[in-house]
Swiss-Prot record:
It comes from Caenorhabditis elegans. This is Nuclear exosome regulator NRDE2. Pfam families: NRDE-2. GO terms for biological process: mRNA stabilization; negative regulation of RNA catabolic process; regulatory ncRNA-mediated gene silencing; regulatory ncRNA-mediated heterochromatin formation; regulatory ncRNA-mediated post-transcriptional gene silencing. Residues 119-135 have a biased composition (Polar residues). Residues 1-22, 119-209 are annotated as: Disordered. The gene is nrde-2. It comes from the Eukaryota. Interacts with nrde-3. One of its GO terms (cellular component) is nuclear speck. Residues 192-204 have a biased composition (Basic and acidic residues).
């Protein structure tokens, strides 16, 4: 028999041997079978009751109880026992299980139905089933009916049924009529009579029970068919259906297989289906899990709730708190306290906290903080419900929240948070509402002292292309700067008393002004930015004595500044500028023509370079779009200088008027267009100087990176080595900005030198900061030109050039020593980078050689090209430069011949320089044995006063060295406390230098230690302790700003020293875990430093799993930062978010580079997410470069559309998009030009060349030149 059609796909019951049994034997067998089934079920249920006793968790660890998990078995009376399924199963699941059990029981009863009583006709499962036929609907007995011994009893049974039918004749008649109507609709009357007669002839005498015909391929689900041979056939054919179209056309019935996924694993991962479920989980119906009760309970207890959004209050009791189950069955009574303490009735941590917040707010409706918390948590709950079965309607929720906020505003109308929240809810309900701008304006008038009001107002206009307008955003920035300036200077008296944190308001004043300048740079308005910065320095430094300035004479200074601005004289940042006050005195004898001639040289350069650029770019035989973009970018830098007089008044303009009229150059910036930054009247530190100079590209030794542009950060991130890195995204005005910034730095430095010329030995903090900034800036420019694998570097020329440029600095002995030691530190860091780059080149060469050998063995001739070839002389050059650096250190800071503690010249600056020099000597000697021995001897001589050869053993040497370093550390602490005023600013303090020297000593004497790993572990533990102390000191309000600044310098120097030694090849793999801990702590302590962010990304870029771990870590950081950004002002928040995004992007880039072009899709997906989070045009420019490698459709419809939606004001963003388009059509260029001009409506300047006819003419000229040249 074919199993698919017999007994509903189940196994046939065993037959009783012998002849067909009589009625008595059948009855006895049925009773015995029923009794046996009941007995087995009772025994199984009894065993389950014993095994499923209630356990109570009482502890963790070993236990003498009956339970292996540390539980105690409790015997319970039967009347108190409740089935666990009845307690822990949902009612819907119970109902489904009951229906399933009923269907299974019905099929089993049909398959094994016996004649328990002779009068009841049933199908014997032990006999062969009769031929299937349809039961007659006629009440007439069939002629084929045979008589049975129990016929009389059957007649009585039929009469009883007849009596019951006679009582409901009307009901039967109605059913018969409905049945007849249905049958008439299916066939005609003739066919119905013919079918009736045929059914009457074929009807069996037995009353047959209706059988459910099994599915045709149900046998494939049986375990016997789960074999290797039948598995492939059962993978797809799971269900069939008839082809109705073929049937109606007269073609025989055809069965079509419906394929459905059944092989639920991926080849190679047969025993791990996690990846399969993540990818194909939605495409197949999962099998129901049948687990015992205690396995399910154990699984639920191990389930840990995960947060998808940051919450301000931590979970109640934490995630990992072990909770005891309350024995509800054995309690005399149950009250609310018992239910509250029960873990089953307790909600998850977030829901519980939300209920508590609602309760707190209901008790006091005037509690604003509770209302804000309730609204934020309900919004998070709504975000959680998206995609689930729970209903979530953000618009309706925002409307309900708005009503709550309106009621709270009536009670407290002077609360800025409530008023701001009302506008935010209105934006969620209707983002295009015309009243939002007016509401924001009214709010800024009422609360001009609240930074978050201005930030939300500016964000709404700037980062939404539907709202953005140049004039609208410009007016908003100017209103903000004007009102905040009045608050910081005390002129806005109406809200002066409302300011609670005046230093924070000053920081916001500077931050919002820098943000205004960054926006102008992105709009390609570099001349306006430079004009504002020059006016700022003239107002604060060029007019009179700044330190005596008060708010009473601010109007006079403004009038004086306007007079100077309109005179056309050189300003601070121009060549030859000495300040407005001095320039006005010197220009009393100059005429207007003489002043005009001061700018003739600059105009001559401008005209010649403009004509050269147009001729070179537009006349080249290239695509007109690419040529136009190149012209625009070149002109950005050429015409970035601020003009003091009009170009048309110059004599040179008349000779070149035809070429210059077609190019829209910048005109002079009038004084009424200037919005200079006015420093607070009682501010004497001038902390605003460094942010302005960093914006222009000047590098400082200790920078916060909070005020530099993203393009500069990415440019510094890109190193001149073989590492995969970001695409270059310059603003094309860096050269002119750097030139102006460098001139301003020189002015500030020489101004401080003149102030301290009467006391040359005094180390002015501001003067040393400007001096080291000039040194680091020039060194960074030299670093960009270096090729570290060859490392061609002339040390003497670099130092000599710097001395020649600034001779006044080296006239002071201490300044020359400070300059020399900082220059030596730069040289040492370059030498270390050269070693790493050479190691990378050697590894790459080995990989290429191995690849070439494998190809040759396979018989394939593959010409492998080496991008970088490391020569023997390159390795020798690195060692030669190391020796030269050591000699220069010895010249700058000579070695001490006695102990540093007993030195005659034991001043604090001298001690700092000696310690710094010894740290550099240790860094240079780590990879050379001869230099290592020499450095050990120097350490013993300066720390212990004796040579290393005088010790009998290494243990005695190490013990004495440790004691000497501890003694030196105590001496340095005492020096810092007593002579802190004489300490060298911008350098680490003596205590930090001594701590770094201890680190160097460990690595210098590492091969002499018996327990080297223990010593390195102690260094990392000590460093982690210092990070914790640094966080505590940073949050200590009793410490001053300068002390916290020095703490940051000290910890950075110690961390960099540790990183230097861990980065060497011989230590990188041995102490890899220690290195990871150190980088992780450094990235947390200094989140705005790109150096540690890049290292963190490199450590987590070895594979996709590492990147995903880093992604989870940074996502948790970003959740906290985003929550803070919505509630409070912090100048570091934007930079920290940017660094986190760059870290993730860098890691994904290195991971995707391992698989070639196939990784571009992964790269694009993750970079796009980071760009949307940062809202930075520079990041979107990176995304556009990746999108161009995927497809033009993704570039246009997704990447560029999203980027323009957030940063439509960024001009370079549009240029990068046009350049990335590979498929260009006629008219695309003019279409983009019109789009840019439309978006820049109201700007003073947008594009340089917009005439299509002029571009075509230049192209024809270039074509004629090329033909004539042939």
């Amino acid at each position: 028999m074919f199993r698919a059609y017999g007994n509903n796909g189940l196994k046939n019951p065993e037959r009783i041997s012998g002849e067909n049994p009589d009625l008595y034997t059948q009855t006895r067998a049925a009773v015995q079978q029923r009794a046996t089934t009941t007995l087995k079920r009772n025994e199984k249920q009894k065993l389950a009751v014993q095994n499923d006793s209630v356990f109570q968790q009482v502890g963790i660890g070993e236990s003498d109880s009956d339970d292996d998990n540390g539980g105690v078995r409790i015997r319970m009376s039967p009347h108190r026992y409740i089935d666990p399924d009845d307690v822990f199963t949902l009612p819907e699941v119970k109902k489904q299980n009951a229906l399933r059990d009923a269907k299974i029981a019905a099929r089993a009863a049909q398959a094994t139905a016996y004649n328990t009583f002779p009068s009841v006709k049933s199908l014997n499962g032990c006999q062969d089933p009769p031929e299937t036929s349809q039961q007659s609907t006629s009440r007439k007995r069939s002629a084929s009916n045979s008589r049975s011994p129990s016929r009389s009893h059957s007649r009585r049974y039929d009469r009883d049924n007849g009596r019951q039918r006679s009582r409901s004749r009307e009901k039967k008649r109605r059913k018969k009529e409905r049945r007849r109507k249905r049958s008439s609709s299916r066939s005609s009357s003739s066919s119905r009579s013919r079918d009736r007669s045929s059914r009457a002839r074929d009807t069996s005498s037995h009353t047959l029970m209706k059988m459910n015909k099994p599915a045709k391929y149900a046998f494939l689900t049986d375990e016997e068919y789960r074999t290797c041979d039948a598995y492939i056939s059962s993978a797809f054919i799971t269900q069939t259906k008839s082809d109705c179209e073929n049937y109606t056309q007269g073609v025989p019935k055809k069965e079509i297989a419906k394929c459905r996924l059944s092989v639920k694993f991926i080849v190679g991962l047969e025993h791990n289906n996690i990846l399969f479920n993540n990818i194909y989980g939605a495409e197949y119906a999962r099998d129901k899990e049948n687990r015992p009760f205690w396995e399910q309970l154990d699984r639920y207890l191990k389930d840990v709730p995960k947060e998808t959004f940051f919450r301000y209050v931590p979970p109640v009791g934490g995630y990992w708190k072990i909770r005891d189950r309350v024995d509800l069955l054995n309690l005399d009574h149950i009250d609310d306290d018992v239910l509250a303490n029960d873990s089953d009735n307790r909600k998850d941590a977030f829901t519980f906290e939300l209920e508590q917040a609602k309760k707190t707010f209901s008790e006091n409706v005037h509690n604003i903080d509770a209302l804000i918390k309730v609204i934020s948590m309900e919004e998070e709950m709504c975000r959680r419900n998206v995609g689930s079965f729970s209903s979530s309607n953000p618009a309706a929720l925002a409307e309900r929240h708005q009503e709550m906020v309106k009621k709270a505003i009536k009670a407290d109308g002077r609360n800025a948070k409530l008023r701001l929240m009302k506008i935010e809810l209105l934006i969620k309900m209707d983002p295009n509402s015309p009243t939002i701008i007016d509401d924001f304006k009214n709010l800024t008038i009422t609360f001009p002292h609240e930074p978050m009001v201005w930030i939300k107002y500016l964000d709404y206009i700037q980062y939404d292309s539907n709202v953005y307008n140049y004039k609208k955003l410009k007016n908003a920035f100017e209103d903000c700067i004007r009102q905040v300036t009045g608050l910081t200077n005390g002129t806005l008296l109406s809200h002066l008393n409302a300011v609670n944190d005046r230093p924070l308001l000053r920081m916001f004043h500077l931050w919002i002004y820098i943000r205004y300048l960054k926006w102008m740079i992105s709009c390609a308005h570099t001349p306006v930015v430079l004009a504002n910065i020059q006016a700022t320095f003239e107002y604060n430094f060029g007019l009179a004595d700044v330190e005596k300035r008060t708010s009473t004479n601010s109007k006079e200074r403004e009038v004086r500044l306007e007079e100077f601005w309109e005179s056309g004289l050189p300003r601070i940042g121009d060549e030859g500028a000495v300040g407005a006050e001095k320039m006005l005195k010197q220009s009393e004898e100059l005429s207007d023509e003489d002043i005009q001639k001061l700018e003739n040289d600059d105009f001559d350069i401008l005209i010649s370079r403009t004509e050269e650029t147009i001729a070179t770019c537009l006349q080249a035989q290239r695509d007109v779009q690419i040529s136009w973009i190149e012209v625009e970018r070149e002109m950005m830098n050429i015409d970035a200088r601020v003009k003091r007089t009009k170009l048309k008044d110059c004599e040179l303009y008349e000779d070149h008027v035809d070429d210059l009229e077609t190019c829209e150059l910048w005109d002079i910036i009038p004084f009424d267009r200037i919005r200079y930054y006015e420093a607070p009247g009682d501010c004497a530190n001038f902390d605003f100087v460094q942010p302005f100079l960093e914006l222009l590209g000047v590098k400082f030794l200790n920078s916060t990176n909070c005020f530099t542009t993203t393009e500069q950060i990415i440019s510094d991130w890109i190193s001149n080595d073989s590492t995969v890195n970001f695409y270059k995204t310059p603003t094309y005005t860096e050269k002119k900005c750097f030139e102006v910034g460098n001139n301003i730095l020189k002015f500030m430095l020489y101004n401080r030198l003149k102030l301290t010329e009467n006391n040359p030995e005094y180390l002015d903090k501001t003067m040393v900061k400007y001096l080291l900034a000039m040194l680091v800036t020039e060194a960074s420019e030299q670093e960009k030109k270096l090729n570290f694998h060859s490392f061609k570097l002339n040390l003497k020329n670099l130092v000599g050039t710097f001395i020649t440029k600034h001779p006044d600095i080296f006239k002071r002995a201490m300044l020359s020593k400070i300059t020399g030691i900082v220059y030596m530190e730069k040289f040492v860091s370059w030498w270390e980078r050269a070693l790493k780059e050479q190691e990378k080149v050697v590894e790459a060469d080995e990989r290429r050689k191995n690849y070439k050998e494998i190809k040759m063995e396979e018989g394939v001739v593959d010409d492998v090209k080496f991008d970088v070839i490391l020569l023997k002389k390159d390795k020798e050059r690195v060692q030669t430069i190391r020796d030269k650096i050591r000699d220069m250190i010895d010249i700058a800071i000579p070695k001490s011949t006695e102990k540093l503690i007993q030195s005659a010249d034991s001043s604090l600056p001298t001690l700092q320089l000696h310690l710094y020099a010894n740290v550099l000597r240790g860094r240079l000697s780590i990879l050379n044995q001869n230099a290592l021995e020499e450095t050990r001897d120097v350490f013993c001589k300066e720390i212990l006063g004796i040579h290393t050869s005088e010790f009998e053993s290494d243990e005695a040497l190490l013990l004495a060295l440790d004691q000497g370093l501890n003694e030196l550390l105590e001496h340095c602490k005492e020096k810092d406390n007593l002579e802190s005023v004489d300490s060298i600013p911008e350098l680490p303090r003596a205590e930090a230098l001594c701590e770094a020297l201890k680190v160097v000593a460990v690595f210098v004497f590492l091969d002499k230690m018996a327990f080297s790993r223990r010593a390195v572990d102690c260094l990392i533990a000590n460093a982690i302790t210092k990070f914790e102390q640094f966080e505590a000191k940073k949050n200590d309000f009793n410490r001053g700003t300068y002390e916290k600044y020095c703490d940051q310098i000290d910890l950075k120097f110690i961390t960099d020293t540790l990183i230097t030694f861990f980065s060497h090849k011989k230590h990188r793999f041995i102490y890899n875990e220690n290195f990871k801990k150190l980088i992780f702590q450094a990235s947390q302590a200094f989140p705005c430093d790109s150096k540690y962010a890049k290292m963190l990304g490199e450590l987590h870029s070895s594979g996709r799993l590492q990147v995903m771990k880093l992604q989870g870590f940074t996502d948790s950081r970003n959740s906290i930062l985003n929550a803070k950004r919505d509630q409070q002002f912090d100048p570091e928040l934007e930079t920290r978010l940017l660094m986190n995004s760059l870290t993730i992007m860098f890691s994904w880039m290195n991971a995707a580079n391992r698989i070639g072009d196939a990784g571009n899709q992964i790269l694009y997906k993750n970079w796009k997410r980071e760009a949307a989070n940062t809202r930075d045009p520079a990041i979107w420019r990176q995304v556009i470069r990746v999108a161009s490698k995927l497809s033009q459709k993704i570039l246009k419809d997704d990447a560029y559309t999203r980027a323009r939606g957030q940063c439509t004001w960024a001009l370079n963003l549009h240029f990068d998009y046009i350049e990335a388009k590979t498929v260009r059509k006629n008219g695309d260029l003019m279409e983009m030009i019109y789009l840019i001009l439309e978006q820049s409506m109201g700007q003073e300047h947008s594009l340089f060349v917009t005439d299509e006819e002029y571009m075509k003419t230049q192209q024809e000229i270039g074509l004629q030149y090329s033909e004539s040249g042939r």
